């Protein structure tokens, strides 16, 4: 599925009451709704910036990985750059 700008009816980014992290909701013209957690958007932005600003890199792939040992405040499930 490729989502074009004209496919999007509304995009809302907010920190819901009682939460600490950003949620982003995308509503498409056909009524479908997608809600993204902050970490998902952060990873999307991270990958975008890595490719857009790198002088030769044209692709980056982030793969999901579970970490049993991690720094405080970090989620067990992380998207990490594929080597």
What role is predicted for each listed range?
Residues 34-71:
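Acidic, low-complexity, intrinsically disordered interaction modules
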Residues 2-32:
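N-terminal acidic leader/helix
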Residues 65-83:
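Polar/charged, Gly/Pro-rich intrinsically disordered segments
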């Amino acid at each position: 599925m490729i989502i074009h700008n004209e496919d999007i009816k509304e995009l809302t980014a907010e920190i819901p009451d009682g939460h600490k992290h950003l949620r982003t909701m995308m509503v498409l013209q056909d009524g479908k709704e997608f809600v993204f957690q902050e970490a998902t958007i952060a990873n999307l932005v991270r990958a975008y910036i890595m490719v857009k600003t790198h002088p030769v890199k044209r692709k980056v792939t982030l793969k999901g990985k579970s970490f049993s040992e991690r720094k405080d405040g970090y989620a067990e499930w992380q998207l990490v750059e594929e080597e």
